[in-house]
Design a protein with these regions (language model features):
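Extreme N-terminal signal-anchor transmembrane helix of membrane signaling/transducer proteins, especially
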Residues: 3-34, 38, 42, 332-333
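Cytosolic-side ends of inner-membrane transmembrane helices, especially those
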Residues: 10-12, 25-30, 329, 333-354, ...
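Extracytoplasmic/periplasmic sensory segments of membrane signal-transduction proteins
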Residues: 42, 47-49, 58-176
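Solvent-exposed, extracytoplasmic
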Residues: 50, 74, 80, 111-137, ...
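Extracytoplasmic/periplasmic ligand-binding sensor regions of membrane-associated signaling proteins
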Residues: 124-228, 278-281
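Amphipathic coiled-coil signaling helices used for dimeric signal transmission
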Residues: 365, 378, 382-404
Length: 405
């Protein structure tokens, strides 16, 4: 392919330019991706850690706010008065009365006397005003008495009797009271994905539960700080439970995805860090994560006995965009250098080959008997020396030929 000297010289120059270029691009990619990967991973871990601290503050703030309702003298007095109706009744009679309302509850309209008494009494108006001040964060608030019957609510609840529900039993805690947070779930009554804050209302001595308040918080508003995190086109944060369920993120409906078991096992072994793995959508990603550390503000059985983690992740192709941009720049510079090498090599090759072509043509003419042919090569190198030697040989041959004639 490159039989001529000129072609070989050009080929050699291209190879000399190409090999360092390939090595440079490879080292740039390997070194750059390693540094970028570590930098992004560390930054994502730090962002996840801050998000987890934010999450803890949000939950603790909500507990404090709901607790402020639970200790309100106005609410406590109303519940104490409501509980008086049980004093003159036996347990069977109480159960019978509660069941009689529970059985007809689904058929009752908002304008029925029973419902109006619950959603329009003075405590109901009080918690409605409180809910209004909180905006869209609270989807529903209601209060039960000591037996689990709803006595005040912002709107009609799905059930009248609540004492057979897990959340009520946890918050009641055998009459001793305990702050309980439910697992995130879809609430049929409020029609939202919700986190329920269940706070016991204690008597004045703070030793006996007299009622329970339940606040149903819409997680889209409660966790807006998670939803609003965006990094580039694909980067965002997720709130993930220890069973792998993505509770909420910026791009999917709540509770609609699960991450792979390998990833959840990896993060469960650490309180925080970063890793490379497939995210909940099966996309290779850089993922920073941090465990949400809770205090002692709620019972250990809260949140479905699950841990929560914050993920901050981004698709790897997008994360590596700066490296790809650098590679393009390095490649363009490499192509330009190869072009320059080629042009320089072509110029040098022509300077080398031109005397050789003159030499070739001249030797051919001398060989044909034209002994007066002289090689006009003035280069001060081996080719010039060879041309002078051939010229001397031609002169000698010409003289000998003339003598013979």
């Amino acid at each position: 392919m490159f039989r001529g000297i000129q072609g070989k010289i050009i080929f050699l120059a291209v190879i000399i330019g190409l090999l360092p270029g390939i090595v440079g691009v490879t080292l740039t990619y390997l070194g750059g991706t390693h540094l970028l990967k570590n930098s992004i991973g560390s930054n994502f871990h730090e962002l996840a850690r801050k998000e987890s601290e934010y999450m803890r503050r949000v939950i603790e703030k909500e507990i404090d706010e709901v607790h402020s309702l639970a200790i309100s003298p106005f609410i406590r007095k109303y519940i104490e008065d409501a509980n008086l109706k049980y004093n003159s009744k036996g347990n069977e009679e109480i159960i019978r009365e509660i069941n009689s309302i529970e059985n007809i509850w689904p058929r009752l309209k908002d304008n029925s006397p029973i419902i109006r008494e619950i959603i329009n009494n003075e405590i109901a108006e009080y918690i409605k005003e409180y809910k209004k001040r909180e905006g869209e964060e609270y989807a529903e608030i209601f209060i039960t008495d000591t037996k689990g019957a709803v006595i005040a609510a912002t709107n009609k609840t799905s059930d009248y009797f609540q004492a057979d529900e897990k959340w009520w039993e946890e918050a009641y805690n055998n009459g001793k009271g305990s702050v309980y947070l439910s697992d995130v779930e879809y609430d049929e009554s409020a029609k939202v994905f919700a986190l329920n804050f269940c706070i016991p209302i204690m008597d004045k001595s703070n030793k006996r539960v007299i009622g329970i308040i339940k606040v149903i918080a819409d997680i889209k508003h409660l966790f807006s700080g998670i939803i609003n995190v965006h990094i580039g086109e694909t980067g965002h944060s997720d709130l993930v439970s220890s069973d792998g369920t993505v509770i909420i993120d910026a791009i999917s409906p709540p509770l609609s995805w699960k991450i792979n078991e390998g990833l959840i096992s990896k993060i469960s072994a650490s309180r925080g860090g970063w890793t490379l793995d497939k995210d909940e959508h099966g996309i290779n990603s850089i993922i920073g994560f941090s465990h949400v550390e809770w205090g002692s503000k709620f019972s250990a059985s809260s949140l479905g006995n699950k841990n929560w983690y914050i993920f901050v992740r981004q698709d790897m192709p997008e994360a590596y965009t700066p490296i790809f941009g650098l590679l393009w720049k390095v490649s363009i510079v490499g192509v330009l250098l190869i072009g320059i090498f080629t042009l320089v090599a072509l110029s040098i090759a022509r300077q080398i080959v031109r005397p050789l072509l003159i030499l070739q043509d001249g030797v051919g003419l001398i060989g044909q008997g034209k002994l007066n042919q002289r090689l006009e090569i003035k280069t001060k190198d081996e080719i010039g020396d060879l041309a002078n030697s051939i010229n001397s040989m031609a002169v000698e041959l010409e003289n000998r030929t003339n003598e013979l004639e």
